[in-house]
């Protein structure tokens, strides 16, 4: 993955994957967004996931793109923690965060230089409890980037979505992502 991006969803590789799904990807200095057609209309929606906090210059550029691409709106989901008052400081830019984000509000980085004991101490009690349950059932976490492991992932995803009754992307979507993003 491109190490210069703020988040994997802002990487060149992610943009290439999204282009392969049929979306228009617009890359600008410091961010990339996707343009989604609204069926049976001339309109589109822009989507900017996991970007840096928007600046005044970025908002001006987004407005230009929005007009050119006939966007009815551009959904912003910056990869930043909320401020102490629980709000992002975007009102002064004339924008607001999405009411219904598609992804987690922000991604955090876990410092793996800490001891296991210190890491566990910093976790929520429920997280520690779930780890102990997994250990009790001999759950192993391994890194396996083989095609066989990917097929197992697809099988587990299908079983989980059926059992838990939630939506996940299609098998073809996951295969396209895998083939685009996996290391050769």
Question: What is the predicted function of each stretch?
Answer:
Residues 1-42, 80-81, 92-103, 107-184:
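A conserved beta-strand-loop-helix scaffold within acyl/acetyltransferase catalytic domains
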